[in-house]
């Protein structure tokens, strides 16, 4: 059915992004595993609602598989500020109680090391905005309605371009590509 079709497309696009992220993952990121698990456990036990909580049982770095999307989001939340910069402060709000100085120091040192890996950090920040590959019933209703309306919307846009004497070069390019075939 169409819903499964579009969910599969979403999954492939998300996995493609995760593959890009995985290819840029620095070798020293593996040292985050016990730190992330520690932070995740503390966030869970302190009832702090954050993606970091998903890291509570982390034993390996996440893979590029869609099933690990939430783990990557947890790592992004742990490492990055909302703006995508590397965290400067390590505190209780991300799972590090004040009395845990050793692990806080280890994490601060790792953050300093990771700050040199700009491409990885950029891709990690992008992961935060990736959607869940499965549509909720409401999301599916909106998407299905949009798909039904798209042909009418395209016709309306063509009419507007025609009335205003404008040229839609993108549509011309797509039509030419369709006419020539894909070889």
What does each model-identified segment do?
Residues 175-183:
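Conserved RecA-like ASCE ATPase "motif II neighborhood" in helicase/translocase motors
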Residues 165-176:
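Conserved pre-motif I regulatory segment
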């Amino acid at each position: 059915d169409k819903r499964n079709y579009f969910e599969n497309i979403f999954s492939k696009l998300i996995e493609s992004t995760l593959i890009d992220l995985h290819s840029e993952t620095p070798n020293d990121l593996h040292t985050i595993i016990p730190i992330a698990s520690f932070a995740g456990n503390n966030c869970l036990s302190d009832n702090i609602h954050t993606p970091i909580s998903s890291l509570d049982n982390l034993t390996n770095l996440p893979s590029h598989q869609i099933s690990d999307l939430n783990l990557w989001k947890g790592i992004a939340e742990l490492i990055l500020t909302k703006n995508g910069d590397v965290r400067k402060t390590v505190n209780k709000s991300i799972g590090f109680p004040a009395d845990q100085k050793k692990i806080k120091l280890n994490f601060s040192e790792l953050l300093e090391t990771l700050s040199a890996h700009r491409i990885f950090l950029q891709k990690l920040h992008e992961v935060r905005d990736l959607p869940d590959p499965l549509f909720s019933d409401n999301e599916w209703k909106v998407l299905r309605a949009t798909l039904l309306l798209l042909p009418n919307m395209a016709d309306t846009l063509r009419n507007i371009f025609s009335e205003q004497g404008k040229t839609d070069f993108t549509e011309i390019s797509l039509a030419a590509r369709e006419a020539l075939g894909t070889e």
